[in-house]
Amino acid sequence: MFSLPSFLTTFSFTLPSLPSISLPANIQRRFLSYVLKRTLGRFVSHQALDAERIQAQVSEGWVEIENLEIECSEINNYIPPPLPLSLTSGTINKLTAKLPFPNLWSDPLQVSLDTLTLDFTLSSPSPLSRGRAATRPEHHDLAESVTSAADDFLHHELDAYEEKELEGSIRQSLILSQTDPFISDVPGGFPLGSPGEISPGRPLPANMESTTVLAGMVERILARLEFRVEKIKIRLVIEDEEDVVELTVGRIRYADESEAQTNDDGKSTTRAIRISNISLDIVPSQRKPPSLVIPQRQSLEPSVSSSTSTASTSSGNDYSDMFMSQAVVDLRQSLLTPEQISEPANEQTVHESNMFYSALSQPNESEPGASTGIKRSGISQNPKLADEIEEERSRSETPTPETKPQPSGIPVLSFGQEDVVLHMRTTRPLISAGHQTSFNDNKPTVEMNITIGTITTVLLPSHLKLFISALQTLQALCQKDDVPAAKDKPAQSTSPQTRLTATTKLKAFYVSLVYDLSAETSLNLHSTMASHLTRPTNPIPYPHLRFRLDTLVASYQSPGHSNPSRPAFTRPTPNMSTANLRRKSSGHARFGSLPSNLTVNVGDISLFEWMGEGMIAPVILFDPGLKHQYDLPSAPPHKGQAGFPECECRDWREEKKTGSEKAWRVRPRGRGILKGGARATTEDEGPVVHVRQDLGSDSAAVINLQSLHVFVDLSLIERLLPLLRSVTPLIHPPEPTPAWLQSVPSQSISEEITPESIISSLSAPPPTARGKKMKADIRCDLVRLSVRCPAPPPEPAERQIGDGRQLRSGIVFVDVHGLKSRFMDTSRTGTRPASSEVANVEFEQTLIFFASVSQHYAYPFLIFAPLSPEPGEEDIPLLPSISLSSFPQASSLPASSIAKTTLVTCKMPAIRASVHHPTVTGLQYFADDVTRWLDVAFADGSAKPRDELKMIGSRFFGGSKGSEASSEIDEPYDVEEVAAGMKVEIEISEIDMGLYVPRLDASGERVFSFKANDLGVRMETHPEENETALELSIMDLDFSDVSSTPLRILGRTTPFTLTSHQAPVVYLRFVSSTDLRTTLKESNISVALSHFTFAVHKEIAWLHEIAQFAKPPKGVFENLSPTDLTRLSINLSSASFLLVPPNLPGSIVILVREVEGKTEIPKGATDSVLEVGMSGLGALAVEGESGPLEVSSDLADVWKKAGYAQLAEVMVLELRLMRELVAAGEVSLDITQAQFKVTACADSLATFAEIATDFGRLFPNKKEEHVKLPSMGQSINVFDSLDENAFNLLPEIVSHSDTDMIEDDLPHNLDYLDHATRISKHYPSMDRTTGENLRAWHTPEEGLEEGEWENGESGETIRAFGGEIEEEEGYWEGLPILNDVYSADQKPGKIHIRVLDASLKIFLHDGYDWPRTRKAIEDEVRAVRRRLERIRQLLASGQKADESIENATSSVLFNSIYIGLEQKGEMGLSTMGMGKMDEKALMAAIDEELDGMETESGSSWQTLPAGVGAGPSAVHQAHKKTRLKGKRLVRSKKAQIEITLSGIKTDVDLYPTEESTSSRVHFTAKEMEILDHIKTSTWKKFLTEMKADNRGNIRETDADMLRIELVGVRLKEDEEELRLRAKILPLRLHVDQDALDFLKRFFSFKAPPMTSARPLAQHTTSSTPDLYFQHVEIFPIQLKLDYKPKRVDFRALREGKTIELMNFFHFEGAEMTLRHITLSGITGLERLGTTLQDLWTPDVKANQLADVISGVSPIRSMVNVGSGVADLILLPIEQYRKDGRIAKGVQRGTNSFVKSTALEVMKLGARLATGTQVILERAEGVLGGKSGEDVVGQVQGLSTNAFGVDSGMLEGGSSSEDEQEAISRYADQPESMKEGVQAAYKSLSKNVNAAAQTILAVPMEVYERSGDDGPLKAVIRAVPIAVLKPMIGTTEAVSKTLLGMRNSLDPSARRELDDKYK
């Protein structure tokens, strides 16, 4: 483009008069024509500039040219290629120039243009215009162009004679001049000496030529130029648009307005450009631009004008080109270096051509083809236009203007009545003659002042569409900016730099946007807009947005070069390679220009919405009083609203505001009559926007803003939607980069690699350092954002757009204090870094307020602030910040579609919140209003919400395409949008939140404190997958109730440390994705909670209060629609749930090691399913206060160290929960697999029950008022129907109802006995109690004869009677359905719980968990010891013992623990009591007891393990090793009793209130066992199933061992009664007395009442009512008992407890049946158990005593033998009665007799052999001296009587853990005869070998011993061993052999032995 001529910038003085140079006339005419052609020939028609066609008076200096046609192709060559703008036509009506001859140097040169018309077209560039950059000429300086033109004229236009003549005239004129024309160093002048130095005879200096003199003359003439342009009209035609943009300028004047004076600084020259009547119209396209209007010639006006063409600037690639002193050089010197001349003409450089382009680049006219450059003109391109011009010319030589009326367009922009004035004042310092000055002292000073009045513009919707279309066309080529351009070369200019000061003043700027689409159809639209443009204060009657800017002052200052003698270092541009940097340039980099600065001040800026009826609403407003409205909080609040300020607020839409804009500003505090409103703030006088930037350096633009208030009314967006919808179709993504631009290489210019370039590139800074230069720094004291949402319509169907004045929720204010925003420039290097920071925002504090509709003050509920410093710290606080960065993302898309991912990083040091219930309610209303507003505003379906608002994020408004990615992902795939992603990372160091929750009883507020540390939020969009992910993590949190005493509710279990905890407490991940094929939205929510404790302290009212606190109000969030599919996953790990009862001091902890739950909620689903899997679930309890929690690797150890005891554990739990979302909302819970484990001691289990019961009081049953039952008028005697003699009648023995009595008692009725014996015991008979048929499965091993079943039942003869069977029709269909007796109601309930497979193990430990229990036992032991010592003293003194000694020497604690004298020996056998015992025996017993106590309790001290006990005082407490009967008081390591239930299935149904049945529980267990783990017990299973009864019946397949049904019946009084039914399969019991005593002691334990932590509340004072059983039915239970007694309680015998007689006998196979019992009206479980015991015990004693006695061990053998004898006699008789075959009966009887007799004989023999073996082993121990060593191990803990039977008199209780476990010798029996013989041989050989070794070892021992009796003792000790060892082996061999034979004959007994023995 053009460069500013030198005379515009450096001519700061009045030109002196040039010497009178007389030129020849012919030379003058030829020179004039040549100059015009050289200057204007390329831009206009060339023939019009011929000397013959120019109307001129050369003598007067007047030249006039009419009807000039602009050469469009030449103008288009100067338009940049990326700009899609082309000139289609242009005309100049008249061009007039006046040269004031002969006073050329004093009078001005006047040039005027009249009626300039230019038509441009905005469209996509054509292929022809794309190559115009290659033909653009190079740029040359104006001085160079003038010099070249002068030289060309002299050497080509003139011949030698004319040139000689011209040189002589110039020489003569210079000699005659008395004034040195170059004293002031005129541009183009040459430094000559005084006039006297030039003489006619002296030749000109060698360096002065005629061309230089001629160039100086031209420069002096142009310095006096005055230019004027009138009637300028520029039209812009936009492609595919109906309207044309027309810019009209009335007049442009350029003149010299300097005064003839010189100040002390030097001479100054003032020039001015005045532009008048600027307007912009939108003209309809029907009115085409006039073809070529040739108006009538007008008179020449004397006014001085100037041209704007001379003010055009260069492209601006080199900053020095903008200075207007560029051309001030010596015209004798050429600026072209050899390198520049040698460069190709098509190479793009920073130099561009101007209007005085050098003739060296153009061919001469005289040369062939000189006119090829101007062939294509505007007329030739438009044939129609050319024909019209020819027609006009044929009519008249001077055509008349057209008179056709033209429709006027709609005015859009106006500059008002004031002119745009540009003043330029150039001042050059005075230089005295002969004084040598430096360049710095000779620098000119230029001052430019631009004054603009009021600019007013009004945009209609169609205008906005027009401009957007134009911008869209320009945007289409914005992506081509990265096409590499030519490299800039550093300018090597030695001219001094001008000191420039430029100031621009704009009075006001108004922009009005009419958003009402119907406004364009108004009849008075034209007049209204014209009136408003003329006077902006005139209102526009259409709804519109008005932007106002007042008093804009912009100032630019440039001090010039600091040292122009050295070339300035040019910073490489992004398209310049570092290879262009030479070594010498880097050395002078510090001598560049001093930084220039730019300053912009704006008085005021505002944006208002003007609605109809005079309503005005603010949108953007600068308010200096905002920052003084309240004081910022300096410390975090602790309670209440301390630290949270308040501010006045009001709804700006509440009232009509028609006054000034100050009505919406904040009123300063303290203003008033009494308060002296003199608090006049000075902020109003200052600018609201202040911008300052130092140019030419890396400093950023600093923008200071006053307090800014932004009003966001969502109804405004609703009113703008029609406009946005009309504009949205114009917004479309840019087209891909054309191939012709993509083919341009990144470095199209070859560069020479030199050593200097390599060194310079190495010393250059890295690209990343330059890429992060700060571009702008914006600072604002306070920014307030006020948001309001209009109330939704009353009915959803109403979707009308209203004014939005009604408000339902409230207003949200966001105040940002101390805002500092920094924007980085990342486009300075060619290679951008991988990650670059784009912007960074910091602020001191941000407060979020909320004010409801009725409130006049707003209170903040959220504050973002820096961390509060610790006391005494003076560190600079870390401010909250938001950083915006971008980095490339990996993508599989094409390279042209990949965009950078935007990263937003937010660092918030601290967040404080104070949330009240009105605020929560208001925010919920606000959120609901926004949601419903979106539904209403975007409900018509014409466009999606993202489409209307898409232009807001477009590049027109500074947005980014990437910000829209994944915002609405259910649209068609868009490559440009998908390729861009976004990541948001939020880091919060601390959160302190206070919740003020109203209490349910309206007694005030409950205050909750929520604190969290190290909170992180991360959001990431995956464009390729159409997925958005959100992650939330909290490392530490604390949620407490601080209303009175702080109670922690939720928090990390143990203190947070960096080494112990790595996982966050809360982790949330939300992923939203959309399937592009199916357009289904899917949401995945994952919640992970770990290492936390949730506590429920003494009440749960706060849960209801928080639920009520967060509950949405009625009518809120009712229209929300879920996504198509929602997946929810919840994971809990290392979680603890602390349950603190309301009254007791203890607590329960539920531990969760791992829980995972998953659910899916499809859109429109009728039910939801939740699947949960658990592992490691446990329950612990503590009796009192617990100790502090310490870090441990195991979660259970953490609580155990604090004093908790393990009680329950769930190893595996898998459940499935299904809930109906419609209808009645039924809930179904299926537990597919569960494994439960209970471990407890007597005291901890009781405490757990008490705490659980107390905690259950927190959930009282909501019972309705009792319904009053109707009363009868008369009484009824309920005993009228009672038969008093009913029980006195003897029952009929032979009746069918009493058939079961045959086995209850001894048979005595022969008739009935004969009938019963007809049925074989192997026949599948009817159950004697239930009437049910039980199948009998037999094997050949059980002694059944082959073919027995085929021959009939028990050999009976079946007779078939003749005759046909008559079948009754419909009989089978009419049979009634038999209801299962265990399923009263099969209808599932509203809540159905089903357990499919579960197992339960209960481990009962010996000892006690609580220190309180152990301490009570220890204290009682000491008390009993003191009493015994006192009694011993009394007995020693001779006093007699009385009956009171029994109470004094014993005590019973907790109804379970006996402390006192052991009743054994003579004392135990005495039936008289201690009071009548012998004193010696009593004293011996007391001494033995005291010695035992001394040994057990006084032996040593020990320290309990950490955490054993409750409370801190129990930790690390030393106490004595107290033992009770040889056992420790702490919990035993191993369980003593194990209760196992497996195969559990349960159905639980809860029915709605309208049903008569309230609940139903059906419980079944496939296996039930009780294992005996007591070390002194040799039996394995205390209770198990019975393999087969005495009749051979075995258990059915898949039969349940235990079945219980419990049904709850709802009464009219809303009370429930229970119905219980239970059935248990036959049980097999192996009862050891130690195990029985342990169970009695365990379950009879009654802990002392716990001290209540607080008085019972009113609702908990009433005791929990006991269960009331309306009906109880227990089906018969068959038992088979083995019992081994070990001691007898003689005290119980003396008290009359006959059950103690069982301890005298050893029972084996004793059978009994607990009869079928039906009860009614039983209250409580304890009453139920007592009643059952009272009914069953007498029945067993009365009716089944024979069966029980037959189980005594010696009697049992005789009974079995007697049964064989009976079979030998009775079976032949029975068989004879049946079929008369006596032989078969004899055979069966004989087999039974032989088998039973043989079994008993072998059994008795084995027992005798085992007993003999034990006696021999004990004798060996006594004789061999090993009685105290291993006799226990050999005997294996058993004592036998003389008959070899296990003795029941073994004294002592259950052993301690230190004792060795006893193993019975009957365990591990051989299974067959073969194994028996092998075991016998092995035993016999082992003992014989031992005897042999003993005999062989005697001689050696005799030899070694010395003395008289040594050898004798050795022989005596060896003889018994040698004799007894073979005997022991023999007895053991006999026992093994007999046991093997017995097990071979009776396999069923072998299986029972595996269950019996350990």
UniProtKB/Swiss-Prot annotation:
Q: What is this protein called?
A: Autophagy-related protein 2
For region Disordered, the annotated ranges are: 286-319, 360-412
What are the recorded Gene Ontology BP terms?
autophagosome assembly; autophagy of mitochondrion; glycophagy; lipid transport; pexophagy; piecemeal microautophagy of the nucleus; protein transport; reticulophagy
Entry superkingdom: Eukaryota
One Pfam match: ATG2_CAD
**Domain Chorein N-terminal, residue spans:** 30-121
Write out the biased-composition intervals (Low complexity): 303-315
**Compartmental location:** Preautophagosomal structure membrane; Endoplasmic reticulum membrane
Topology term for the membrane? Peripheral membrane protein
Described by its record, this protein's role is as follows: Lipid transfer protein required for autophagosome completion and peroxisome degradation. Tethers the edge of the isolation membrane (IM) to the endoplasmic reticulum (ER) and mediates direct lipid transfer from ER to IM for IM expansion. ATG2 binds to the ER exit site (ERES), which is the membrane source for autophagosome formation, using basic residues in its N-terminal region (NR) and to the expanding edge of the IM through its C-terminal region. The latter binding is assisted by an ATG18-PtdIns3P interaction.
Which stretches are annotated as coiled coil?
none
Keywords per UniProt:
Autophagy, Endoplasmic reticulum, Lipid transport, Membrane, Protein transport, Transport
Q: Enumerate the GO terms in the molecular function aspect.
A: phosphatidylinositol-3-phosphate binding; protein-membrane adaptor activity
Q: Write down the species.
A: Cryptococcus neoformans var. neoformans serotype D (strain JEC21 / ATCC MYA-565)
Q: Does this entry carry the keyword Acetylation?
A: no
Instruction: Identify one Gene Ontology CC term for this UniProt entry.
Output: endoplasmic reticulum membrane
Q: Which InterPro entries match?
A: ATG2 (IPR026849)
Q: Which reaction does it catalyse?
A: a 1,2-diacyl-sn-glycero-3-phosphocholine(in) = a 1,2-diacyl-sn-glycero-3-phosphocholine(out); a 1,2-diacyl-sn-glycero-3-phospho-L-serine(in) = a 1,2-diacyl-sn-glycero-3-phospho-L-serine(out); a 1,2-diacyl-sn-glycero-3-phosphoethanolamine(in) = a 1,2-diacyl-sn-glycero-3-phosphoethanolamine(out)
- Membrane-crossing segments per the record: none
Main location (coarse class): membrane
Spans of biased composition, class Polar residues?
Answer: 397-406
Q: What protein family does this chain belong to?
A: Belongs to the ATG2 family.
